[in-house]
């Protein structure tokens, strides 16, 4: 897709200069008032930085960041470039966004923390980088899952075990009432024992046992029933 399909002519000129590596021209146009932090008026409300990311031109992306493109600036859908590139097949992009001031706790358009994308793809470099840069492992998504609970929901138990070692709270319950103990117990009852995730699920369960969690855990239905009675669980 061409830039002029999304952005006004002055912005397109800046993007063209950036793609040529012409920092002088791009900077002059920006100093004259061209703003890189705008959204296309049509859904999904793309930004110039997002457009450059989609070209996969890392030199151009780096120059745009240097010239003031904000990795935290939200698209029309609510996400931003940090959440967009976390877990992608292009590992340099996340580091570039964070180095330019990107928020490691950015949310996607569906209100998922950026680290969830990295967990979903088991992109270890991105997971570790986000944690190194201050990602909150207990930030929750819409259904109330933190990083460890989300990882368990999608059977990424090696990642879950690592997250638990780095501060993820194993007590958090999703809005439906499920906690990590319930999810891992359910996973172990269904998972093929030859799965590479099976021994990691066992490690997660043992971690919970060592923390004093009793098995079998309460089911989500039992938890919701207690919640309905005003009881603390």
Regions found by a protein language model. Name each.
Residues 87, 103-153:
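Eukaryotic tandem repeat interaction scaffolds
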Residues 6-16, 39-50, 74-82, 107-115, ...:
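Ankyrin-repeat boundary/"N-cap" motif
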Residues 69-117:
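A generic tandem-repeat structural signature
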Residues 22-30, 57-65, 90-99, 123-132, ...:
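Ankyrin repeat structural motif
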Residues 16-21, 50-57, 84-90, 117-123, ...:
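Ankyrin repeat A-helix N-terminal signature
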Residues 1-13, 133, 166, 175-233:
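Ankyrin-repeat-protein effector appendages
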């Amino acid at each position: 897709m061409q830039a002029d399909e999304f952005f006004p002519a002055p912005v397109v000129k800046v993007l063209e200069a950036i793609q040529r590596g012409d920092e002088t021209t791009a900077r002059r146009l920006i100093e004259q008032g061209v703003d890189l932090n705008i959204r296309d008026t049509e859904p999904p409300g793309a930004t110039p930085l997002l457009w450059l990311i989609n070209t996969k031109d890392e030199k151009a992306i780096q120059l745009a960041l240097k010239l003031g493109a904000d990795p935290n600036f939200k698209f029309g859908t609510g996400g931003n470039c940090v959440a967009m590139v976390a877990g992608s097949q292009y590992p340099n992009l996340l580091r570039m966004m964070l180095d330019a001031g990107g928020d490691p706790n950015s949310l996607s358009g569906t209100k998922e923390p950026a680290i969830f994308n990295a967990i979903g793809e088991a992109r270890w470099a991105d997971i570790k980088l986000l944690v190194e840069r201050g990602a909150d492992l207990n930030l929750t998504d819409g259904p109330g899952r933190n990083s460890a609970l989300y990882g368990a929901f999608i059977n990424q138990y090696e990642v879950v075990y690592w997250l638990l070692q780095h501060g993820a709270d194993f007590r958090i319950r999703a809005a439906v009432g499920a906690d990590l103990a319930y999810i891992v117990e359910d996973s172990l009852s269904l998972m093929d024992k030859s799965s590479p995730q099976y021994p990691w699920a066992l490690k997660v369960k043992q971690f919970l046992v060592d923390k004093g969690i009793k098995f079998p855990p309460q089911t989500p239905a039992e938890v919701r029933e207690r919640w309905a009675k005003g009881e603390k669980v």
